[in-house]
Amino acid sequence: MAGVGSAVRRLYLSVYNWAVFFGWAQVLYYAVTTLLESGHEAVYAAVERPLQFAQTAAFLEILHGLVGLVRSPVSATLPQIGSRLFLTWGILWSFPETHSHILVTSLVISWSITEIIRYSFFGMKEAFGFAPSWLLWLRYSTFMVLYPTGISSEVGLIYIALPYMKASEKYCLRMPNKWNFSFDFFYASILSLAIYVPGSPHMFTYMLAQRKKALAKAKAA
């Protein structure tokens, strides 16, 4: 029974990783072709649906960690996926005024290259039991460029959206109300920007440690 359970787990994770891989491949293809043909102003409209699918599907990774399907710590997975879902739905989908900015292009290209590498790496490991050394190197090295460009784009887009949040009062809950609770999306977004200050260096340091560990293990093997 344990063998059957392991096979089902590997099949599920393989299908999951490759499905999301193809989602991100779509995002990158549409982003690059639209950028070259129509300019950065048209990129978001071209990638919106596959971007929403691929990024929202990542929510399952939190559940995978919680139920023990994967060994990735939820403490590392949750903030990264949470921030990306916030950008995907709370910023880009909620505030169309951001769509024509060049940072949308740098964001989706940074995200998509990162995730194409990551999901193909884990997809190969689940499907075949191994990943080639060059893919391992890409998995644990490209973040040194793509993480800063992605984070800078995230921070920039949140900042750009702030005036539109304040003017529209979207997602705000004012008192009095039956819950006796108030919420202001504008100030919550400012708080999220403040969290990036310690959070981004912490995540980058964590990924550097993971890189050192993974490449040393591969070299020893």
Swiss-Prot record:
The chain crosses the membrane at residues 12-32, 52-70, 77-95, 101-121, 142-165, 185-209. Pathway: Lipid metabolism; fatty acid biosynthesis. Residues 33-51, 96-100, 166-184 are lumenal. Keywords: Developmental protein, Endoplasmic reticulum, Fatty acid biosynthesis, Fatty acid metabolism, Lipid biosynthesis, Lipid metabolism, Lyase, Membrane, Transmembrane, Transmembrane helix. The keyword DNA-binding does not apply. One of its GO terms (molecular function) is 3-hydroxyacyl-CoA dehydratase activity. It is found in: Endoplasmic reticulum membrane. It catalyses: a very-long-chain (3R)-3-hydroxyacyl-CoA = a very-long-chain (2E)-enoyl-CoA + H2O. Belongs to the very long-chain fatty acids dehydratase HACD family. GO terms for biological process: fatty acid elongation; sphingolipid biosynthetic process; very long-chain fatty acid biosynthetic process. It comes from Oryza sativa subsp. japonica (Rice). This is Very-long-chain (3R)-3-hydroxyacyl-CoA dehydratase PASTICCINO 2A.
